[in-house]
Structure formats: structure tokens, C-alpha cells
């Protein structure tokens, strides 16, 4: 499992001109799932992201988690994170999980994040989405389970 995490001042996702998810501040997650991922990977990433200290304390040091600052999470499914661009001019997405498996594991992942005590908003799995955010910092990290 691969997640691009962005600390966000605000974020939203729109499908067919309608906002389907938005947060006032917290983390925007682009979530990629490969065919080898399991519920164990999803739980690991959910716990890691929820407790990662990437928000500043009073001294400006990254010392607080999204839980500590009472932030929220906007989670977006993103199969293109497993695009392989090493050969040719078109990405190969063979490492991305099949949609039915990926959707089940993506839903499980979001529930695991909620179990950590976070409010989670999502996009629409498999849809074309417009994602808007103000990246805070900017702080952008890649978190992987393997």
C-alpha cells in the first residue's frame, strides 16, 4: 500500500460538479493499493498516518499528530500511484490491484483510520474526481507498507 500524504489547510473533492467530501484542515491522502496488499497493510498505514508527528508545536517543531491537533482526513483512492513509467511513454498499471479488491481494501483502510479516532471524508471510488487543497508547509510524504 502506498499513500501520498499532504498536510492541508483545507481540502475538498468534487465528482460531477458536486462536492462529495471536504475537510477544514488535516491530512489529504492519495491511497494506492497493489494486488499484494492485505488488511494488515491497511491497518499498519492507518495507525502510522494517524500518529505521525507532522504538525508543529508552539516552538515550530513537528511534534503533533493529526489526532493531537484534532484534524480530519480526506481520503482519495488513487490507482495511478502504482503506475510504472520505466518503459515506453505510457504508464503501466499492472501493479495496481483489481478494482473490486482495491475498493474493498480501500473501504477497510478508511474504517481503520476512523477507528483511530479521526473523522474521514472520501471521494468516490473509481470516479473521475477534482481534488482541491491548500498544502500546508508544504508537507508532503510518501508512506508505504512494504
Curated annotation (Swiss-Prot):
It holds the Pfam family Tyr_Deacylase. A motif (Gly-cisPro motif, important for rejection of L-amino acids) lies at residues 137-138. Keywords: Cytoplasm, Hydrolase, RNA-binding, tRNA-binding. Signal peptide: none annotated. GO terms for cellular component: cytoplasm. Its EC number is 3.1.1.96. It is found in: Cytoplasm. It comes from the Bacteria. It catalyses: glycyl-tRNA(Ala) + H2O = tRNA(Ala) + glycine + H(+); a D-aminoacyl-tRNA + H2O = a tRNA + a D-alpha-amino acid + H(+). GO terms for molecular function: D-tyrosyl-tRNA(Tyr) deacylase activity; Gly-tRNA(Ala) deacylase activity; Ser(Gly)-tRNA(Ala) hydrolase activity; tRNA binding. The keyword RNA-binding applies. InterPro entries: Daa-tRNA_deacyls_DTD, DTD-like_sf. GO terms for biological process: D-amino acid catabolic process. A Gly-cisPro motif from one monomer fits into the active site of the other monomer to allow specific chiral rejection of L-amino acids. Homodimer. Belongs to the DTD family. An aminoacyl-tRNA editing enzyme that deacylates mischarged D-aminoacyl-tRNAs. Also deacylates mischarged glycyl-tRNA(Ala), protecting cells against glycine mischarging by AlaRS. Acts via tRNA-based rather than protein-based catalysis; rejects L-amino acids rather than detecting D-amino acids in the active site. By recycling D-aminoacyl-tRNA to D-amino acids and free tRNA molecules, this enzyme counteracts the toxicity associated with the formation of D-aminoacyl-tRNA entities in vivo and helps enforce protein L-homochirality. PANTHER family: D-AMINOACYL-TRNA DEACYLASE 1, D-TYROSYL-TRNA TYR DEACYLASE. This is D-aminoacyl-tRNA deacylase. It comes from Bacillus cereus (strain G9842).
